[in-house]
């Protein structure tokens, strides 16, 4: 039986979140064993925030949740790809559909931002 290897990165694994229909990579976040199990049990994506040092469910503040369609691991069992149905317009906390909207062009990084919501309105803190 394959067991996910959480030890290589100090208890965390990268989780690549991909739109199930388009194949677009929406975001990359980190999971520990607890958040992977929460994801598998609930059918929603859960992560561990290294910045805030806490667990969080995608969309718990914005409403832009993710329904899990399929979960895969790589040949080393130290990374997962989670194919999701994205609920709401955007996966990124900046309001963009994907967190990957900055592109390397002609020797520099260029932002191709097209926010679908205003983060200042959605994340009222």
Swiss-Prot record:
Its EC number is 3.5.4.19. It comes from the Bacteria. It is found in: Cytoplasm. Pfam families: PRA-CH. Zn(2+) binds at residues 75, 92, 99. It is an enzyme of class 3 (hydrolase). Mg(2+) binds at residues 74, 76, 78. Binds 1 Mg(2+) ion per subunit. Pathway: Amino-acid biosynthesis; L-histidine biosynthesis; L-histidine from 5-phospho-alpha-D-ribose 1-diphosphate: step 3/9. Its cofactor is Mg(2+); Zn(2+). GO terms for biological process: L-histidine biosynthetic process. GO terms for molecular function: magnesium ion binding; phosphoribosyl-AMP cyclohydrolase activity; zinc ion binding. GO terms for cellular component: cytoplasm. Its main location: cytoplasm. It catalyses: 1-(5-phospho-beta-D-ribosyl)-5'-AMP + H2O = 1-(5-phospho-beta-D-ribosyl)-5-[(5-phospho-beta-D-ribosylamino)methylideneamino]imidazole-4-carboxamide. InterPro entries: PRA-CH, PRib_AMP_CycHydrolase_dom, PRib_AMP_CycHydrolase_sf. Homodimer. NCBIfam families: PRK00051.1. Catalyzes the hydrolysis of the adenine ring of phosphoribosyl-AMP. Belongs to the PRA-CH family. This is Phosphoribosyl-AMP cyclohydrolase. It comes from Geobacter sp. (strain M21). The gene is hisI.
């Amino acid at each position: 039986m394959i067991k996910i290897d959480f030890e290589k990165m100090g208890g965390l694994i990268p989780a690549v979140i991909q739109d199930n229909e388009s194949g677009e990579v929406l975001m990359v976040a980190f999971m520990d064993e607890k958040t992977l199990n929460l994801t598998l049990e609930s059918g929603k994506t859960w992560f561990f925030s290294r910045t805030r040092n806490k667990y969080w469910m995608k969309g718990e503040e914005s409403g832009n949740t993710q329904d899990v369609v399929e979960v895969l691991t790589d040949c080393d069992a130290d990374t997962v790809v989670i194919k999701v149905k994205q609920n709401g317009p955007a996966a990124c906390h900046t309001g963009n559909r994907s967190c990957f909207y900055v592109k390397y062009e002609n020797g520099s990084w260029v932002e191709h931002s097209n926010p679908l919501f205003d983060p200042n309105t959605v994340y009222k803190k």
